[in-house]
Swiss-Prot record:
The keyword Protein biosynthesis does not apply. GO terms for cellular component: chloroplast. Belongs to the RuBisCO large chain family. Type I subfamily. This is Ribulose bisphosphate carboxylase large chain. The lineage of its organism: Eukaryota, Viridiplantae, Streptophyta, Embryophyta, Tracheophyta. It holds the Pfam family RuBisCO_large_N.
Amino acid sequence: VGFKAGVKEYKLTYYTPEYETKDTDILAAFRVTPQPGVPPEEAGAAVAAESSTGTWTTVWTDGLTSLDRYKGRCYNIEPVPGEADQYICYVAYPLDLFEEGSVTNMFTSIVGNVFGFKALRALRLEDLRIPVAYVKTFQGPPHGIQVERDKLNKYGRPLLGCTIKPKLGLSAKNYGRACYECLRGGLDFTKDDENVNSQPFMRWRDRFLFCAEAIYKSQAETGEIKGHYLNATAGTCEEMMKRAIFARELGVPIVMHDYLTGGFTANTSLAHYCRDNGLLLHIHRAMHAVIDRQKNHGMHFRVLAKALRMSGGDHIHAGTVVGKLEGERDITLGFVDLLRDDFIEKDRSRGIYFTQDWVSLPGVIPVASGGIHVWHMPALTEIFGDDSVLQFGGGTLGHPWGNAPGAAANRVALEACVQARNEGRDLAAEGNTIIREASKWSPELAAACEVWKEIKFEFKAVDTLD
């Protein structure tokens, strides 16, 4: 027959330390925890095999194709410092294994069945290098950072947002009223919470209409362009598109999608529609922590961030470093650069395993949201820079005088920080002084400073560098 039946060790075929990676290969860095007694070479080779051409036994149909051309290869293994039984296994995948322009297909291969593999105790995808040839098959974000600034006519500062709370339970009219007050008070955007879709107490069409009214009224009164992230996420792709189309008919500037719960296929369709019709697309990452919070299993958020830039979105939530949700500074800034910049050098100190060239794919604006308030403004301005959205939900709506004064307090704090930075002051060292000085001529800011002066969320980060 010319083929030898039976089970053979993966490493005989899939562990190739002499392999020179090609510019067209997709490269992956996996954190592998093998079962006791399984050598790291076998574990790394098993990952390469099960996520590409291999299966558990030799099959005669292997002879009908060129495995050498199509197989994934584990080409390097490093022990993880400080962890006795963990290894970083580097795997190279030939580009032909993947459908063009499909994040869905890429993930189905690379993070598919292999994560349930018995020979491994745990497996985490730490990073991916997307080759230029593959990047070029994606449209990417509908518009990108510069086009968004031009559409909004806002330059030289971070943008300000607010998630409307309580997230569930308001009627459409009251919801629209809260949006109007925040936008009128000085914010650039208000936002649907990720789980606001179309519930019995507030159907989507009513919400869209009242929010559009809030946008137009506040624009007329302030002379600034305003927006509300209308969440188009729905139970079916068709319904999602229907909502996006209605938003466009209302003439609003931006819609929103929950890209992990909604799925990459739906997200990419929506991103294409948004580019074709001039809508900005805000992305919420609900469900990300299910995938990325465990240190030894799952997928790091930097991979989900890269996937989103390929699939398409103009904003994405990216942690705050200082608020109530997880995120260590160096790691967060690492994937913030991966979202915004055109070319990112390998830098293991920030968790970046590969040099990534996006070849002019538009950038994504990171959104800092979750447990932040006016006292955080100097740190946020310094950490995230101008190309970011700073979102204060409770930090706006929790103001003792109401929503509009809460919005005004945030806007004054932001303008004060940007001015201080532009004058060459050190925001990290003088932040509190800058806020105090500004609050002398803004009673709204003074009241906000008083309410939140003692609030801190101080826990040790789970997602740390080794």
